[in-house]
Each structure stands twice: as structure tokens, then as C-alpha cells.
Amino acid sequence: KYAQAKKAPAVALYYQHNAPLEDLKVFDIVVVEPDHGYDPLALRAKGTELYAYTSVAEVQPTRAYFKNIPAQWQMARNGHWNSVVVDQTPAQWPAFFADQVVAPLWQRGYRGFFLDTMDSYRLASRFDEAAQQDGLVRVIETLHERFPGIQLIMNRGFEIAPRLKGKIHMVAAESLYRGWNAGASRYEEVPLADRQWLIAQLKTIQDRDGIPALAIDYVAPHDRALARETAKRIEADGFIPWVTDSRLSTVGVGTLELVPRRILVVYNSSESPALNYSNPHRYAQMPLNHMG
């Protein structure tokens, strides 16, 4: 079993602009939105790997490569996220995804990728499930052929995981205990039956395939206590936790919880001609340094 074989990495996901990389460097893996211009080499020397978020079976019109996707490959729409669902069955699709989505990011220095929307073909009114899954497998196999050493985190894709041994670094799933209802725009507790089903899927991935499992849950950003409690429940189940807000725009709680270390000190410049002789510096420097 994976959990017994090695220590699981600490993982964080942050999708908005201006990710606080200096704070997130305590995690082993940080998934970011690569279009926001991050340097993937920024934290590698410090032991933190930036993974690029990529959407496999959905694409938003704002993506640069959207205009190059043939109309006949567009099989449905996801109204909640204003995205188009991409058919995975065309023979040219794996090369398209490798060339136009992953290759530019690889050239920038990314070596890890978070593959999202693996089961979005189910949003279409008609689809051949086996053919769609075969297409997803071809995408991942093509990535390994084109980019030796690539590291992939797959969001769901439980059915194809046994066919991808050695090619998937981690399998993720959202909403184990707490989720975000995009249609109703609210945070919700996951129903027991759904939770039990998802736990069974993740445990199978870990025990049968030896792939670590990451559970991503969503809690209102002001409710830190609930986020902390949820992360502990996920970790107690044997999975890597990440609990954050619905927009993935805050530093959440995972295997690690970041402790704030920045203090704003206000002082009166008329007290002293030099900052190091001001009262806040004289009386606060030592205890603040002691606190880290």
C-alpha cells in the first residue's frame, strides 16, 4: 500500500493571480494556473515543484488554443464554467493536446501537470464511454512518449487508472466531505452515500494500483476551523488532504497548515531619527524574532 511504503507529499492548489509562492514553498507540490505567468523553476531548488493546471476534456474560450479546436470535436457545453467539452476520440486529439497545451508549458520549465476534467464527456447527451476512455488513455500515453519524465496528477479517471500504471503520479478527487455546489453557489456537506463511494474508489486506487490519492474539499474561507477539521478527516482516511475555498484563491489546509508569520508594526517616525532606535523596534524586535 502506498501509505505504508513512503511518506505522502504535501500538496497545495492555488489557481488565482499572485500566488504567495514564498509561503507555499513549504509544500512539496503546488498546482498553479500557468497562464498567470509563474516561473516553474522559482521553487525547484528549494524542493517545491510547481505543477501546471491543464484541462483535458474541457476548454474555455479564453485559452489561446481554443480557436484551433475543430468544431466537430466540440461535443457539449458546461454552463457552470462557460466551457466547451472536447471529444476524446479523434485520432489527432492526443497530438493536439501535447503540441498546443503541454508543449508550451514544458518549454517554460514545467515538469508536472494536473490533468482536470477527465470525465467531462459525460456532460454530452450521447457518448461512447469506452471510446472516450480509450482516448484519454491515448492522451496520457502520448504525453509520456513526447515528454520523458513528465509527472501527472489525474483528477478522477478511476476507470482508466489500472491501464496507466507507472504513468500517473497521483489521482485526485474533489468533494470527499465538503463540496461546492456551482449551480446553487453554496458550500455543502457531501451526502454519506457519495462519500462512501468516493472513499472506496480512492482506496482501490491506492491499494490496487499503488497510486497516492489526493482529496480536494471546499470550505468557506472564513471557516478555518471547519477546514482544519475536514483536512484531519481526509488524512485519517489515508488520503492527502487539501481544503480550500471554491475559487482556490486562498492558502488552505493540507498535510501542512501554514502559520502566518508577517506582522505589521506601526511606528512614529518623530520618535527617533533612526528606525532601529524607535520604540517598536526596541521593544518588539526580540519577542517577534523569538516567535519566528
Regions found by a protein language model. Give the residues of each.
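The substrate-binding groove and active-site-proximal loops of carbohydrate-active enzymes
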Residues: 26-32, 81-94, 126-130, 185-191, ...
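Aromatic-Pro/Gly-enriched surface loop or interdomain linker
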Residues: 253-292
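Active-site-adjacent "subsite" loops/lids of carbohydrate-active enzymes
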Residues: 58-100
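A short, well-structured beta->alpha microelement
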Residues: 7-22, 154, 285-292
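Conserved, mostly hydrophobic/aromatic
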Residues: 52, 115, 169
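Aromatic-lined carbohydrate-recognition surfaces of secreted/lumenal glycan-active proteins
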Residues: 136-162, 173, 210-220
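C-terminal active-site rim and adjoining tail of enzyme catalytic domains
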Residues: 2-19, 174-176, 180-257, 280
